[in-house]
């Protein structure tokens, strides 16, 4: 009895109400009754079991079918990634062929929620210059982390341009930034990609 009490206490620990386990036990016991009725239905069918070869073959076929189903799901996820990269390369070729001026959108986000708008611009194959000067340090860290994740998924580039400015570009744009040194008397809090203080 003490072992049973320990198990009951263990189950009660993970459930808020002890009645839930009793309800589950009752639902389990109820399906057991219909299972008993199914064998009764199977008993009249032994007459048809004189043809055992088609039945085992039919029973063997459903088992291989569930195994190929997970593989198409894996293939579909890799196909989605492949389509995304193909779309990015298609946009890169289209932009290379077109003789249009490349514009860079400048954004001054004030809230973390504006990061999704910036990612939408990246999806539209736009370059975005982001200045975090109007955000608090914590919000800027969150926003930069979100944008870095989006950049990784969309195969873009994220470069630090100034102490609070970052350039987010699609895959087809190459950015060469020289290291800009500020005079020693200017105090500006600088952050790396992980937004840790570099001092």
UniProtKB/Swiss-Prot annotation:
Compartments where found: Cytoplasm
GO CC field: cytoplasm
Pfam families for this protein: SepF
Region called Disordered, residue ranges: 15-79
GO BP annotation list: division septum assembly; FtsZ-dependent cytokinesis
InterPro entries reported for this sequence: Cell_div_SepF (IPR023052), Cell_div_SepF/SepF-rel (IPR007561), SepF-like_sf (IPR038594)
Keywords per UniProt: Cell cycle, Cell division, Cytoplasm, Septation
Family: Belongs to the SepF family.
Subunit structure: Homodimer. Interacts with FtsZ.
Protein function: Cell division protein that is part of the divisome complex and is recruited early to the Z-ring. Probably stimulates Z-ring formation, perhaps through the cross-linking of FtsZ protofilaments. Its function overlaps with FtsA.
Name this protein carries in UniProt: Cell division protein SepF
Protein source organism: Streptococcus sanguinis (strain SK36)
Gene label: sepF
């Amino acid at each position: 009895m003490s072992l049973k009490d320990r198990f009951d206490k263990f189950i009660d620990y993970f459930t808020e109400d002890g009645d839930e386990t009793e309800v589950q036990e009752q639902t389990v016991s109820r399906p057991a009754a219909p299972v008993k009725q199914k064998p009764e239905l199977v008993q009249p069918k032994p007459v048809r079991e004189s043809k055992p070869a088609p039945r085992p073959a039919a029973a063997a076929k459903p088992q291989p079918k569930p195994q190929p189903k997970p593989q198409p799901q894996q293939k579909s996820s890799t196909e989605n990634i492949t389509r995304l990269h193909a779309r990015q390369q298609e946009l890169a070729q289209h932009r290379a062929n077109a003789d249009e001026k490349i514009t860079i959108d400048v954004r001054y986000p004030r809230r973390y929620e504006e990061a999704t708008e910036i990612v939408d611009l990246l999806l539209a194959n736009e370059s975005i210059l982001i200045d975090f000067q109007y955000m608090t340090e914590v919000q800027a860290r969150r926003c930069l982390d979100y944008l870095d994740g989006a950049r990784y998924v969309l195969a873009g580039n994220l470069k630090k341009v100034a102490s609070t400015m970052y350039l987010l570009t699609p895959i087809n744009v190459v950015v060469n930034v020289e290291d800009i040194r500020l005079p020693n008397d200017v105090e500006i809090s600088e952050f790396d990609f992980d937004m840790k203080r570099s001092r």
